[in-house]
Amino acid sequence: MEPAHVPVLAQEAVAALAIKPEGVYVDATFGRGGHSRMILARLGTLGRLVALDRDPAAIAAGAALDDPRLTLRQSEFSRLGKVLDALGIARVDGILLDIGVSSPQLDDAARGFSFRFDAPLDMRMDPGSGISAADWLATAEEEEISEVIRTYGEERFAKPIARALVAARQKEAITSTAQLAGIIAAAVKKREPGQHPATRSFQAIRIYLNRELEELKAVLPQCVERLRAGGRLAVISFHSLEDRIVKRFLRTESLGEQAPPRLPIPAAMLKAGRLRLVGRAQHASDAEVAANPRARSAVLRVAERVAEAGA
């Protein structure tokens, strides 16, 4: 197996799960198993861990763990409920989500996620499904490219970037990461200090092609449904769009059903919140950011499932 990669906020996230030795847990974003190893180290012989990842390379690497308490499944985490049903698991004691692309994916030039390497332009978390970045850029309309880069990358130069990409592909196909980064860099007239001009666009295309925000929106309600009372949900996000979705969802689920303004509905008739927020949002320490600059934008949010009335 590859050398163990320590995920961002790993200690904080696993500690937040308050692991019970005989509990059942889900690592919905296995990656290279950093979180899973830490969870397994805290589980007893009767404990169980279900780990998911849509990347076949992650599942192949995870097979080397060879732990009878670990069940690995190649799947998008939006299918969490179906995976648990297939395993005969109704409720779990904790779920961990580490959103976004993993460091091994970024560091593997062949995957085409990063402009740090000149490689074929792919960006798919599961190379066996969906459309590659090269194929999408070859056919997408200029307006669509602009909208994707603006929406998912929060890039203010989305329009000139899209215009430059469409003009460039008319001369030759955009098939490599270096080629894409160069076109974007030439189109961005004003650069952010300390950031490559292609950063936001690469991020936007990756998020769009892998439907990352849709996946997140789909899995969060399933997490609440599958947690037993007292079970914990820990979510690590690296992008403001992701964190916004997580923050709003957890807040809504903690508040419960709200009566319309000036409508006298008794509180007993309203559905209570299903979650209790646990502490404040956590960020990586200065020491962790110094050791791993990717930790700078990481945010950890934790919530606990509340027992339903009458349960």
Swiss-Prot record:
Binding site residues for S-adenosyl-L-methionine: G33, G34, H35, D53, F77, D98, Q105
Source organism superkingdom: Bacteria
Pfam families per the UniProt record, alphabetical: Methyltransf_5
Enzyme class: transferase
Annotated EC: 2.1.1.199
UniProt keyword list: Cytoplasm, Methyltransferase, rRNA processing, S-adenosyl-L-methionine, Transferase
Reactions catalysed: cytidine(1402) in 16S rRNA + S-adenosyl-L-methionine = N(4)-methylcytidine(1402) in 16S rRNA + S-adenosyl-L-homocysteine + H(+)
A cellular component term, taken from the record's GO annotations: cytoplasm
GO biological process, one term: rRNA base methylation
Keyword flag Transit peptide: no
Subcellular location: Cytoplasm
Record-linked InterPro entries: RsmH, SAM-dep_MeTrfase_MraW_recog, SAM-dependent_MTases_sf
Family assignment from sequence similarity: Belongs to the methyltransferase superfamily. RsmH family.
NCBIfam families associated with the record: 16S rRNA (cytosine(1402)-N(4))-methyltransferase RsmH (TIGR00006)
Function: Specifically methylates the N4 position of cytidine in position 1402 (C1402) of 16S rRNA.
Protein name as catalogued: Ribosomal RNA small subunit methyltransferase H
Source species: Thiobacillus denitrificans (strain ATCC 25259 / T1)
Lineage: Bacteria, Pseudomonadati, Pseudomonadota, Betaproteobacteria, Nitrosomonadales
Gene coding for it: rsmH
